[in-house]
């Protein structure tokens, strides 16, 4: 763990304790001063002072890193200093005051509340915002309001190039100089009704706006954003067979160990136990019966203590109420705005500060971005990754296996003890679980059947045990690539597996 990460998590956990008492007594939480009033400013902490509850008040002295004051739920955060990117991002309610300069994408994806910056801001302020108000007393960088859907941005200084590019709603009011708007925006003069509306916010701050201010709004003639291609799996593992090696089959009375224990790297205790190597999507508290009740799930809300909580833009703010109950978190990069490594780490620090120390922390993305995904897992020192086998336009699950394997080998994930899970779009069979395990993915992530989950879990457990006896292995971790065969030339070509009958990989894979 980096020093700044440790400092940030400690600050968040200390704040949780202070907020409890402060809310009861209606007190202001002061951070950055000693008991005697001497200044001890913070410096560079990331993902801190997030998820502030309603009526909370925090004053902090210092300069902060990424995602400061993000996911605000109704509190007031005053920063006596500056900050880097994504300050106030995903804010729902409340108020953020920054007394110096702020970095890129301040207020990104916010949907309510106000952000007041007494200095200047860098590029893409208010990008993709859906509501609320951002006031910048100084200047704003390039592409202010990029992709915004609603809300208001007021810049009392000048703005950089391409203001309002890609905007689909809302308005940007610029009191200083403004270059031609970007694609998707058009410019006009400010109206009297708008001046009156904005003055209600500016006058209490001792500010005003002139009649020559410019307003950027959506260009109704701009082209549409475009529809995202649908991601799917057009073929599963049908072209792959599971075969025994040289071992004899096991007797019917032989004890078996089909359990899979997922541990954080370097740990030997705790972890998450899977009776079947299957992480069930979106079941959670509805499980009933002895089999399904002990099987971990991947849920977006109401997790049990054996469930992983999937976090994306939809539940990023509200997930804070469920974090203490879950066995770990999975940050879904495929359904979050594009962020750099430091911003992703800021979100993870914010979330992981509120979970148990033993909880797992993982990332999820599609297989076509697996190299980037694994690099993040290693550089941010996370516990593993979920790789979605689907692709835009339709992909083959078998084709995902070599991509995952080669990327994992390049990053040395197996030797580091990091866990890999592959996501399919249909309830898994025993063969699917064994094939995934043999290819290096400990767990299959897949939806539950439409009916009777308990019976399905019992059938899957029984079938896996039968396969283990036939393969001659008493522990599911013993299966590997030697137990897998490509059933046809096409599958052998895309997977690098041994072609059944030929009993070796195709020549194009030799040396790889």
Model-found features: residue ranges?
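Gly/Ser/Thr/Ala-enriched C-terminal appendages of enzymes
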Residues: 143, 150, 158-233, 410-415, ...
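Conserved active-site and cofactor/substrate-binding residues in soluble primary-metabolism enzymes
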Residues: 14, 53, 67, 72, ...
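N-terminal capping/small domains of soluble enzymes
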Residues: 2-57, 206-327, 463, 467, ...
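Alpha/beta enzyme core
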Residues: 63, 82, 101, 294-449, ...
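Structural motif
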Residues: 56-58, 76-77, 95-96, 114-115, ...
